[in-house]
Amino acid sequence: MRTVRDAKFVPQWVDLTQEYPAPLFGHITRQYLNLSYGGHPLQAVDLYLPEEGKPPFPTLILVHGGGFSRCDKRDLSVYPGFYALREGFALASVNYRLVPECRFPCQIHDVKAAIRFLKGHAGEYGLDPRSFFLYGDSAGGYLVSMVGATQHGSSLDGGAAGPEGESCAVRGVAAIAPLINLVRHYGQLERVDYLSPDLHKAMLEESSAILADYLGTPKGRLGALAEKASVDTYLTSAAPPFYIQHGTRDTIIPPIQAIDFAGRLRGLIGGEKVVLDLIEGAKHVGTSPEFIEEEHVLSILRFFRTLL
C-alpha cells in the first residue's frame, strides 16, 4: 500500500530525510513570510510569487488541515501550491487560530480576514484581487468550503476583519477531502464497510473527539451546533465554482460527504461549475500520496484557469 512517502515528488521541492516529508522553499526567490492579518501570532500568511510572468498574478490561497488543532502553513500540505507557482499563480499559505484556544467559528473568520488582508495589499504584492482561489485539505477543505458558501455575508462573516470594505469573495474553491455535513457525518462513517473492526472503532472515536473539540461540546453531543457548523446550511445559488476531490477509501471522512455536496452544488449553481473528482483507492489526504501528485493538482489548476 502506497504512503505519502511514495508520492512522485519533485526532488527540489521536498526533504525526504525526515520521518514525514517536509517541503523545501529554497527554489522560491520571492517570499514574504509571516505577514500579519490579525493580532494573534497564528493570524499570519506566507506569500510566494512566481518566478516568471508579469503581475498582477492570480492567487491560490491555501488553508492547511490538521483537525483544527495542529499543523502549519509550512507543512507538507503547502506542497500542491508549488505546482500553482510553477503555473503562474501566486501562492498564499494561511495559518489560523487553533483548537482549544479558538473554536468554531473563529477559524472561518480568520480565513476570511486573511483574504481581506491579501486583497487590501494586492497592489503592493502584485496580486489580482479579482482572481483569488481557495484550496484546502481535510479541516482546511471544510474551512474553504465554509468561506465559499458564506462569502456574500452571513452570521459567519466575522465582522470587519481586514482592510475596511474588502470583500472575502473568491473566484473558485478546491475542497480536498472536506467535511461538509456535521449532522450526518458520524452515521455515514458508521456505515463505511471497508475498514477493519478495530480501525473502524478508532476512527469513530477520533472523529467524535475532533468535532466535539472544534465545537466545544461534550463528545457525542454536538446538538444544534452541528447544523450551524455544516457547510450545507449555508449553500445558495451565490456559491462560487467548486472542485471537490476525495478518496474512495477515505478512513476519516467518507466519500459520500463529497458526493452529496457535489449534488447539492450542481442543483444550485449548475453542473458545469462543479467538478467531483473521486480518486479510486485513495485514503484520507495526508496519508495517501495521490493528492500531492502532479496529475491531481494540475486538474484543479486547469479548472481554475477556465474561470479566469
What are these regions (language model features)?
Residues 1-308:
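Alpha/beta-hydrolase superfamily serine-hydrolase fold, recognizing
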